[in-house]
């Protein structure tokens, strides 16, 4: 019986935690929005993901990381292009690999 009360107490603590952090309220709002949707989406899970994702404020660090990622992609593309040009120049000045082995 004591084990049952301990598990019940943990559940109650967890429920209070979810209430205080706003999780239950947010989940309820999203589920109500799905319920009230005139045309139910084909994927309820996608609906939940979309609406839960929109409920959280955007972390400013995420935007900085997105900008950094875009810059790194540009640098990568420039490096790939430069690498192609340098390889083309190298072919002009070095004999093919088969000729080197024959020597």
Swiss-Prot record:
<dbReference type="GO" id="GO:0006355">
    <property type="term" value="P:regulation of DNA-templated transcription"/>
</dbReference>
<comment type="function">
    <text>May control the transcriptional activity of MYC. Stimulates the activation of E box-dependent transcription by MYC.</text>
</comment>
<dbReference type="GO" id="GO:0005737">
    <property type="term" value="C:cytoplasm"/>
</dbReference>
<keyword id="KW-0804">Transcription</keyword>
<keyword id="KW-0805">Transcription regulation</keyword>
<comment type="subunit">
    <text>Binds via its C-terminal region to the N-terminal region of MYC. Associates with AKAP1/S-AKAP84. Interacts with MYCBPAP. Interacts with CFAP91.</text>
</comment>
<dbReference type="InterPro" id="IPR026060">
    <property type="entry name" value="AMY1"/>
</dbReference>
<protein>
    <recommendedName>
        <fullName>c-Myc-binding protein</fullName>
    </recommendedName>
</protein>
<comment type="similarity">
    <text>Belongs to the AMY1 family.</text>
</comment>
<keyword id="KW-0963">Cytoplasm</keyword>
<keyword id="KW-0539">Nucleus</keyword>
<dbReference type="GO" id="GO:0003713">
    <property type="term" value="F:transcription coactivator activity"/>
</dbReference>
<dbReference type="GO" id="GO:0005634">
    <property type="term" value="C:nucleus"/>
</dbReference>
């Amino acid at each position: 019986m004591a084990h049952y009360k301990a598990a019940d107490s943990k559940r109650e603590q967890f429920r209070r935690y979810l209430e205080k952090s706003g999780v239950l309220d947010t989940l309820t709002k999203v589920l109500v929005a799905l319920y009230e949707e005139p045309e139910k989406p084909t994927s309820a899970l996608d609906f939940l993901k979309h609406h839960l994702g929109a409920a959280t404020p955007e972390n400013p660090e995420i935007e900085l990381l997105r900008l950094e990622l875009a810059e790194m992609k540009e640098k990568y593309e420039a490096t790939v292009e430069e690498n192609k040009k340098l390889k083309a120049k190298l072919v002009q000045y070095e004999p093919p690999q088969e000729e080197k082995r024959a020597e």
